[in-house]
UniProtKB/Swiss-Prot annotation:
Cystine pairs: none
HAMAP family given in the database record: Ribosomal_bL34
GO biological process: translation
Keyword Ribosomal protein applies: yes
Family indicated by similarity: Belongs to the bacterial ribosomal protein bL34 family.
Descriptive protein name: Large ribosomal subunit protein bL34
Keyword Signal: no
GO cellular component annotations of the record: ribonucleoprotein complex; ribosome
Keyword terms, alphabetized: Ribonucleoprotein, Ribosomal protein
Length: 44
């Protein structure tokens, strides 16, 4: 059976990348929350 997770760095960046996050208000709030929490990685 084919597994559901087929990793691809391109898709990863496109769907969860920093540029995408910054392009919407909700995405910016995500980055803001992660900065406040002190996350080492803010996005994919």
């Amino acid at each position: 059976m084919k597994r559901t997770f087929q990793p691809s760095n391109l898709k990863r960046k496109r769907d969860h990348g920093f540029r995408l996050r910054m392009s919407t208000r909700a995405g910016r709030l995500v980055i803001k929350r992660r900065r406040a929490k002190g996350r080492k990685r803010l996005s994919a």
